[in-house]
Amino acid sequence: MTIALGKFTEDEKDLFDIMDDWLRRDRFVFVGWSGLLLFPCAYFALGGWFTGTTFVTSWYTHGLASSYLEGCNFLTAAVSTPANSLAHSLLLLWGPEAQGDFTRWCQLGGLWTFVALHGAFGLIGFMLRQFELARSVQLRPYNAIAFSGPIAVFVSVFLIYPLGQSGWFFAPSFGVAAIFRFILFFQGFHNWTLNPFHMMGVAGVLGAALLCAIHGATVENLYFEDGDGANTFRAFNPTQAEETYSMVTANRFWSQIFGVAFSNKRWLHFFMLFVPVTGLWMSALGVVGLALNLRAYDFVSQEIRAAEDPEFETFYTKNILLNEGIRAWMAAQDQPHENLIFPEEVLPRGNAL
């Protein structure tokens, strides 16, 4: 019989409690449990992007130069997607494609999947960080809920859309000019600007910008400073510590301008949260639809009439011809592996030509 001598107290902490104390300790930069996901993923995503844009070519995947080493600048450098022949392979460094060869892995486009997946989990980690801190200081979690909008857009564009297509090849590459090319691709192949989900996204983002401008200007206008020397030009101090603006005055002002105004701060700020986040969610939903090649707003009757009547043309039919041109020119350049050749006589020409 074995007898263990010792005294167990309730103050004794297990490993989880020790880690919890260290991770959530009050320090200059909060770590938290979410930091175990956020910091490594953000580090690898940014590190992979800087490495790719500095050193790695896209010659083997797109037939392009895409790094500073090859002469690109900040606007033209990119971490490009893998070749279409690799489909939806995760392109793990130790996988059958690269077989542990780092140079080969970079040539195949492995950095793109590396950056995309670590970037997605890094964004999720940042949202969890906001949840964790909100819970620690007893706030509502609306900051984290709002950040789900950018996460939804990133995941839908960089992951779900190419999963619905033939491979990662059709996702955006990580670069400024590369994103612009992807936008043109979306327009030419999906008529994205006429998609109602895109319209809701634009309304949400631009509407949020308008709301921010109005809100900031209104609050700034209502700052006041008491004192004998105060006048119209000296009474406003944007750096003062006290919150001195009047909601009643703001309500009276905008009631006279528009005829309607927000009645309280809670409804006003909820609306400023609702507009951009809903717009981002709707645009993400639309991209999921494009992944399945769903179409919206095809006005076929106008196309038929424009084809039959040389004098009939609308802005819609002109845009359709423009989309055909984008497809014809972009497909041959963007998908060289398909060996697409479009003779001059089949390229789209509008009635005006």
From Swiss-Prot:
**Where, by residue number, does a plastoquinone bind?**
H215, F262
Main localization (coarse): plastid
Q: Where in the cell is it found?
A: Plastid, Chloroplast thylakoid membrane
| Job of this protein | Photosystem II (PSII) is a light-driven water:plastoquinone oxidoreductase that uses light energy to abstract electrons from H(2)O, generating O(2) and a proton gradient subsequently used for ATP formation. It consists of a core antenna complex that captures photons, and an electron transfer chain that converts photonic excitation into a charge separation. The D1/D2 (PsbA/PsbD) reaction center heterodimer binds P680, the primary electron donor of PSII as well as several subsequent electron acceptors. D2 is needed for assembly of a stable PSII complex.
Task: Kindly list the positions annotated as binding chlorophyll a ChlzD2.
Answer: H118
Annotated positions of the N-acetylthreonine modification: T2
Q: What organism does the UniProt record list as the source?
A: Panax ginseng
- One family from Pfam that matches here is Photo_RC
Q: Where are the transmembrane segments?
A: 41-61, 125-141, 153-166, 208-228, 279-295
What gene name is given for the protein in this entry? Answer: psbD
- Write down what this protein is called: Photosystem II D2 protein
Q: What class of enzyme is it?
A: oxidoreductase
The membrane-topology field of this record reads: Multi-pass membrane protein
- Which family does the record claim for this protein? Belongs to the reaction center PufL/M/PsbA/D family.
